[in-house]
Amino acid sequence: MSYIQFESGREKDKARQELREAREAMLQQAKERAELRGQRERQKELRGEADWMLPALAKKLEKPAKKSKKNVSKHKSRSKSKSSKKSRKHRNSSSSSESSTSSSSSFSEDEKERKRRKKKSKRSRKESASEDEWVEAPPPLAADNVTKKEPPQRDDWMTSESLLLKTFSRERKEPAKPNEKAQQIDAYDPAKSGRELNPYWKSNGTGLPGFQKPQDDDERQAKPHSSSSAQGSSRGWRKPGAKAPSPPRRSRSRSKSATSSDEEEEEAVQQPKSRPSCLTDEQINELAGKAIKAELKGKKELAAELNQQLEAARKERAEFIASGESVRNANTRPAKSKASAEHVLLTKVDQSGNVRPLVQSGDPNESYGGRMGPKRGSKKVDTHVDGQRVRYFADDDRYDIKQMFEREKHATAAEVNLQYADIVSKHKNPNDDLDDIFADKVRKQISASDAEKREMQSAIREHEKLVATLDNCERCFDSAKLDKQLLVSLGDKIYLSLPWYMGLQSGHCILTTLQHVPCCTQLDEDAWEEISNFRKALTRMFAARRQDVVFYEIANKLHRRPHLSVHCIPIPASQGEMAPFYFKKAIEESEQEWCINKQLVSLRQKSLRAAIPKGLPYVWVHFGMDSGFAHVIEDEDRFPANFAQEILGGMLELNPNAWRKPRKEANPIGKVKSFAENWKKFDCTQN
């Protein structure tokens, strides 16, 4: 006997109404939080705190821009000087050609005078350049003591015009005789000639037909000649009933495209002009100060103009506050998005983290099918001849030993696992063991074009993932998401910044690379050396305050390409002695009992890059510059992301929410300024 359970409709409606009210309340709370967040951001922008940066860093960033401008100006000045020298030479040559035929003696004297002038100018430049050495000029000689030297007279044979060679003559060239045939060709008039076949030359025509006003239905009436000729000439072997397919008419699409382009132009013309940029509080105060100064100095016109600008800025500020936009959206103009083809070098990352370009086949026909490409049938290759093994794989004859070694070395673990899964999944005989499965698969030839296509598709996917991570990275120096008001010091490859949240201790800072690098084992030598210099400076700075320092880095899930970040946390000197024991015990108990790699690696006598192989995930802790520990992460999913923070928090007896749910810093600019004052004396980037 089955019992039917009835439900009341009122209870169902009541539950639905409660669910709707709960959803509306959640949406209202989220909306209020978003509005409050937007108001805070707008207030920061109005105060000028959104783009604030330390003045020392701003100057350092402005220097390369100034250097580039100076180089451009130097290049322009050099090109101008070269052109002026060329023009002078040209003038000298033209003046010498226009001058009359002078004697060789006068020419040689002019040359000597020019050389003397050059020597005098060089001497004067040297004397002006050397400021330390100077000598008083001798007093001018009396006019009586100066004896005038007569110029030397040359012999007659040196100045005789009969012996001189003529370099040019003043005689004009006789004009060439006119060519009779050329005159006849030039004198031909097609309008008067009776042999002219062009009818538009008759009756004083121009040789071209007159202008005819186009009609509106010209495009509809016009038909391509190719279609008419194709319709007229029918094939003899075809049936008479079959008609050739007529091409689709494109007149409507053309007219639509023309009208759409005209509408776009009209919209572009009718768009209102962009509003002037909204000024911040500091800029408005500066403008008001300039206006007051102009009034005090008695410059009435300038004061009136500045007052007008001030009133306009205040009006625009009121409109901006009423509109609810952000300063960046108001100042920036909408950029036109144009889809352009992008050429990218596809790369491949192996197990050790080395990046190599994707190698493609030399034959372009292998990547296409059809007659030019390889046949689809799977050919079997003989591995044994007369009972002796000749080859192991189907492509052994294609590659030599060096190429085979490179292919095996560059292959990744994911490709090997994929190949193994492919072999096992396609095998049908369950009675065969593993050796039989691989022996049958090896005898079949695998298409090289299919393998290359698979590699190219995987490389394209990896490149798309890399572009997405770079766009969303918050630590890359060129990224728009980087909060530059937290920067403290800037080096050649490394920069020092503070976290956006409240750290475990006052003085918590982060060392990061300018470029996107996943971990310290994949760094270049100069970048690693710069990190060690920053660590030494930070250790000295906190030692002056009687504090010890703990540096740590957790390089986990490297396939996601995280950005390198080495955290620096100061701790009291009394608890700094116990920190190595806490971390040693925690690292030994972090993984399972049986591990492939060594559980604890000491860094007292060797560096991190020599202790940990390239490409493996790891955690690294260093206590000042003396000693440290490293550990290779076995299970990446189970390893905690805040491993070092948990140990330090437990050692310092802090609240767990300090690292589990960190709170945002209320006054980041004040924190940056106080840290920068302590960092000035120990800054390693100023040398």
Swiss-Prot record:
Residues 24-281, 355-383 are annotated as: Disordered. Transmembrane segments: none annotated. One of its GO terms (biological process) is mRNA splicing, via spliceosome. Disulfide bonds: none annotated. Residues 93-107 have a biased composition (Low complexity). Keywords: Coiled coil, Phosphoprotein. The modification Phosphoserine is found at residues 128, 130. InterPro entries: Cwf19-like, Cwf19-like_C_dom-1, Cwf19-like_C_dom-2, HIT-like_sf. SUPFAM superfamilies: HIT-like. Residues 66-92, 114-125 have a biased composition (Basic residues). Residues 24-50, 146-157, 168-180 have a biased composition (Basic and acidic residues). It holds the Pfam family CwfJ_C_2. Residues 6-51, 108-131, 290-325, 444-475 form a coiled coil. Belongs to the CWF19 family. This is CWF19-like protein 2 homolog.
